[in-house]
């Protein structure tokens, strides 16, 4: 069968891998795996356009939105997609068709991205800024649905040992889009107009719509939920002083030491996620290239995805714990080396240095991202996996706001101080990661 041959080409596996899946899911591993690759790749490709670190700040500037609005982009995008997940979890667990949750989330992202395109094409100034921020908030909420559902569906339809590779393949596919976009922006340079940005956003919206259609065709196993437990979680607990999901989240943090250490390690891994914008900011201070360098940074991110996607996917399947540790240390080392080179007369002014550092950090962040995604899928089973993902992401949303506030305060004194703090957090993350058990 062509489907099986293509899957065998993309994913290394053995027949014994499927023993951890239900018998109903085993005949459809290849088809389900390819459908998830395609849908996730389309979503990731759209992310390259709706990028709160690069493209959206450029759009804000082009529309004449107040500069202060740019500072809200990353917190809204990241925290907005994480904070609601513990509240969503009981409702997701109560559903038998969990792929429908992903489809709904993808549809919501398509609508929000189309709204951004409409704003870009029709209004300017502070009205445009408010419109983009509101659309981004809706986008982030919809993204929280796809995030919580995707790992549950992946865990129920694809065996352990293949999940990291699937995520790696989707990363490579989306990276090709990033390279294409980066080359295009680099070619257009400073002449890129708002109309082109609006068209790019409209195209990105269609990617999410197509991804939703593909994901809807995934064949799920017959036993999808533990209905009694899920229903009780979602509908009962009316006598408690606080909502049921808050009680569950607090209990999970209190009683599960492995989960607690994983969240701590993941929180400290923010070094690879939060440091690139400060590298970009330092580069703008150095030579004043401004927006003309956007394509180069997007290109660097895309090349990193092409190089690291499948490699890190296989490393995550081999040991997601060791990959988390290595990525954390590599990010910290990269920051220290970069700041050291900037202190050397002549070396710190090299035009290639910021893009090279951005490339390395993007590569390292890819490894950290695949590692923690694979680890949380492998560490739990069934509805416990859904709860792990939801509570971890909600806690990460809180941590992101806290660390973001601290680094923003340090950046007021100098971007280098923020980078030094993030480098220290990365070292601490590696130490905590060593205490995690192997799950591969």
Where are these regions (language model features)?
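C-terminal transmembrane helical hairpin of 12-TM major facilitator-type secondary transporters
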Residues: 322-368
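C-terminal ends and interior cores of transmembrane alpha-helices
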Residues: 106-125, 330-347
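Short hydrophobic/alpha-helical segments at membrane-entry points of transmembrane helices
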Residues: 36, 127-135, 261-262, 349-358
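Substrate-agnostic recognition of the 12-TM MFS/MFS-like secondary transporter fold
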Residues: 35-53, 73-89, 105-109, 135-218, ...
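Cytoplasmic membrane-interface "Motif A"-like loop-to-helix N-cap segments
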Residues: 93-107, 317-331
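Flexible cytoplasmic inter-helical loops of multi-pass small-molecule transporters
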Residues: 219-248
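Helix-loop boundary and gating motifs at the non-cytosolic
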Residues: 2-83, 258-298
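Multi-pass alpha-helical transporter architecture, strongest
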Residues: 6, 117-120, 207-219, 338, ...
């Amino acid at each position: 069968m062509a489907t099986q041959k293509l899957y065998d080409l993309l994913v290394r596996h053995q027949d014994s891998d499927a023993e951890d899946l239900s018998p109903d899911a085993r005949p459809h591993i290849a088809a389900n795996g390819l459908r998830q690759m395609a849908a996730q790749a389309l979503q990731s490709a759209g992310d390259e356009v709706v990028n709160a670190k690069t493209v959206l700040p450029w759009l804000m500037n082009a529309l004449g939105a107040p500069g202060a609005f740019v500072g809200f982009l990353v917190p809204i995008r990241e925290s907005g997609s994480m904070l609601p997940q513990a509240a969503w979890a009981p409702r997701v667990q109560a559903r038998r068709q969990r792929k429908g949750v992903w489809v709904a989330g993808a549809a919501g992202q398509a609508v929000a991205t189309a709204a951004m395109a409409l704003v870009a094409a029709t209004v300017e100034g502070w009205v445009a800024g408010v419109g983009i921020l509101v659309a981004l908030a809706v986008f982030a909420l919809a993204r929280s649905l796809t995030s919580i559902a995707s790992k549950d569906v992946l865990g129920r339809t694809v065996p352990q040992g293949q999940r990291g590779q699937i995520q790696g393949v989707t990363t490579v596919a989306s990276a090709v889009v990033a390279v294409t976009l980066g080359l295009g922006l680099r070619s257009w340079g400073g002449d890129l107009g708002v109309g082109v940005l609006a068209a790019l956003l409209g195209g990105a919206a269609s990617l999410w719509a197509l991804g939703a259609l593909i994901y809807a065709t995934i064949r799920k196993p017959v036993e999808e939920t533990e209905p009694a437990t899920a229903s009780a979680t979602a509908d009962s607990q009316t006598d408690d002083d606080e909502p049921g999901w808050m009680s569950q989240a607090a209990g999970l943090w209190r009683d599960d030491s492995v989960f607690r250490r994983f969240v701590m390690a993941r929180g400290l891994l923010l070094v690879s996620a939060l440091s690139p914008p400060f590298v970009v900011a330092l580069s703008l201070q150095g030579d004043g290239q401004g927006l003309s360098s956007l394509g180069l940074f997007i290109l660097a991110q895309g090349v990193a995805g092409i190089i690291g996607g499948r490699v890190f996917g296989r490393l995550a399947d081999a040991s997601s714990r060791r990959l988390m540790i290595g990525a954390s240390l590599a990010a910290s080392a990269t920051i220290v080396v970069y700041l050291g080179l900037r202190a050397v007369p002549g070396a710190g002014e090299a035009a290639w240095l910021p893009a090279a550092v951005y490339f390395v950090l993007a590569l390292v962040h890819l490894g950290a991202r695949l590692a923690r995604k694979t680890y949380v899928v492998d560490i739990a089973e069934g509805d416990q996996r859904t709860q792990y993902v939801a509570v971890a992401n909600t806690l990460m949303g809180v941590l992101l706001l806290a660390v973001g506030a601290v680094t923003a305060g340090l950046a007021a004194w100098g971007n280098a101080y923020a980078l030094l703090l993030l480098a220290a957090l990365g070292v601490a993350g590696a130490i905590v990661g060593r205490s995690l058990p192997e799950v591969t």
